[in-house]
Curated annotation (Swiss-Prot):
One of its GO terms (biological process) is translation. GO terms for molecular function: rRNA binding; structural constituent of ribosome. The keyword RNA-binding applies. This is Small ribosomal subunit protein uS17. It comes from Synechocystis sp. (strain ATCC 27184 / PCC 6803 / Kazusa). The keyword NAD does not apply. One of its GO terms (cellular component) is cytosolic small ribosomal subunit. Belongs to the universal ribosomal protein uS17 family. It comes from the Bacteria.
Length: 81
């Protein structure tokens, strides 16, 4: 089975070694066809505490690390200005 990867924006880094990443998905409405943007938040493991709010990051699914944390940060694609 393929390992899931997502790209999103860091919305919170207040926890130790954990960031909250908001991932947007765009899909057409089943009846009306308009593109609907849905946002889902994932808690991801950030071992070195490098991520800042607003950074664009790539996260990868991993084994459960805590009650709600099942993703880890692979790399920081761009830093916030």
């Amino acid at each position: 089975m393929a390992i899931k990867e997502r790209v999103g924006i860091v919305v919170s880094n207040k926890m130790d070694k954990t960031v909250v990443v908001a991932v947007e998905s765009r899909s057409p409405h089943p009846k009306y066809g308009k593109i609907v943007v849905k946002t889902k938040k994932f808690k991801a493991h950030d071992e070195e505490n490098q991520c800042q709010e607003g950074d664009k990051v790539r996260i990868q699914e991993t084994r459960p690390l805590s009650k709600t944390k099942r993703w880890q940060v692979i790399n920081i694609m761009s830093h916030s200005s």
